[in-house]
Amino acid sequence: MGGLRDPHILRGEDGWFYMAVTDMKCALGWNSNRGLVLMKSKDLIHWDHHTVHFPTKYAGTQFANVTRVWAPETIWDPQAKKYMVYFSLRTNDGAIPYDKDYYCYANADFSDLEGEPTYLYDRGSATIDMDIVYNEADSLYHGFFKNEDLGGICKVTARTLTAPEGAP
């Protein structure tokens, strides 16, 4: 860990607190975020923490050349019965030329991510700082995010956390 930003804390289904954080190397600038930190606490005072370094974990894949993994957040996925960690991601080799939203599921002890990042949302231009909430009144997930190119806060909705592109 070189510095932390964008902390997101979630009180879990089991009463524990889960935090996902951008692992930022501040002295190296905005494109120095090669991973994220997963943290877990029973009391908000004592934390177990684990860094997920994408170039190491995903060596040989399109995710090995990340320049930034930004603003991770966590939400419980009732269908998968796991914590979903979602984040904005961009690479320096053109494979992912602008910030797009991806997700992975955290493993059982919240110390690592399972599998490769899966595409969550792409507006066709850079999107960052996604926040997803479930609204029981309309039975929809609402995703709010910043559009880097057009400015402002945008919103998308879905019936499930991992709805196919374009599906409500």
Segments (PLM) and residue ranges:
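Beta-rich carbohydrate-recognition and catalytic domains
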Residues: 1-69, 75-168
